[in-house]
Amino acid sequence: MHHRTTATVTTLILCACLLLSGCSARARQRDLIRNDPMYSATWDGIEFLGTEDSKDDGPKPPPVATTRCFAITIPPEDALQKVMATAEQSGWTEDRSSKSSLTRTAGKGSREGGISLYVSTDIIRCKQYPETNFVISIAL
């Protein structure tokens, strides 16, 4: 009986440790995104509306990501150029092979792995902010 109780307690402790280490890794990743200059940058003609974060629920949550939702009052190409200039100044490297008139992508390394930046006037993912016509997504 004692052996079975010990095994059960050990199993529960291991499960708790695995859960906590996974949760703390996701928390570190969220902090990494929030500490990046692109998370809080602002520009004239690009009005910040709010953010939408990936959900951590479910047995296998999606990658950690934050989408910043904006309404632009300047031409889309100008908005893309302003944002990508700031990204470059902040250490991001633009992926010029995926460049289009509506979308830009960039990447940067970190201790947690690679971070991706996605800037678009085309694919809008902001359900809470229907007036959104420009997004910046940062994902690990």
Give the positions of each predicted feature:
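An acidic-aromatic pocket/loop used at catalytic or ligand-binding sites
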Residues: 2-6, 13-19, 23-140
